[in-house]
A protein has these predicted regions:
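Acidic, mature catalytic/reactive cores of soluble proteins
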Residues: 1-224
């Protein structure tokens, strides 16, 4: 949501994209980009080795395609602190230009997805639905209602309950939920899943997910 002041203004949204393994960075990579757009819906194939198009859409403004536009030397402070290479180049496929009238207020959503029907996605509805789901996650546990903690500790507890949700994902190959060992880089490891099983799934009363996680691990047993 944006509210303009008393003069005409222009908001420019410039998405940056990349295609690489998460253990590496692109510094001197030449992207072989193919893109097409219809209105504000953009389809991008970022590299000849990529078989999956990326789709982008903005609820407002107008899209302007760029050619050979690179955002250079993005700096990663944490990578520097860890002793890794800390600068990377990204590709800028184009920009969304949004005009704002004096004192105008707008709700603008930008959606990037692998789903082709991206123009049908209402960003505001997605956000509101997720906020409602997150509230359900917190209160369905029953932990908050029975807590006698002060507000500061209660906020920390809510954040912790929400954090557990990041580790529970759907595994399409089995059609079951599983626990990943470290979001988003690691896959599901049986040992880590079972170590965290009680805290992630039982204390939070995710019993159906707990059942699916056990079934997933059973299927992964050697010769099982």
């Amino acid at each position: 949501q944006i509210k303009n002041q008393n003069a005409e203004a222009k908001l420019t949204l410039a998405p940056v994209v990349n295609f690489r393994d998460f253990h590496s960075i692109n510094k001197d990579h030449q992207f072989n980009v193919e893109q097409s757009h219809s209105g504000n819906k953009v389809r991008i194939v970022l590299d000849k080795n990529s078989e999956t198009p990326i789709y982008m859409n903005c609820s407002d403004g107008r899209y302007f395609k760029h050619i050979d536009d690179t955002f250079r030397n993005m700096y990663y402070l944490r990578e520097e602190e860890r002793g890794f290479e800390a600068e990377e180049n990204h590709y800028v496929p184009g920009v969304y230009s949004i005009n704002l009238e004096p004192n105008e207020e707008k709700e603008i959503t930008f959606v990037c997805s692998l789903e082709e029907n991206i123009e049908e996605i209402d960003g505001i509805k997605v956000i509101n639905k997720e906020l409602l789901r997150m509230t359900g996650i917190i209160y369905d546990t029953g932990i908050i209602q029975n807590s006698k903690m002060n507000d500061k500790k209660l906020d920390m507890l809510k954040a912790l309950i929400l954090a557990t949700d990041n580790f529970i994902v759907n595994r399409p190959s089995f059609g079951l939920h599983t626990v990943i060992a470290g979001y988003p880089w690691f896959l599901d490891w049986g040992r880590d899943s079972l170590i965290s099983f009680e805290g992630l799934l039982l204390l939070t009363k995710r019993y159906e997910f707990a059942k699916e996680v056990l079934l997933t691990n059973i299927r992964d047993i050697k010769y099982g």
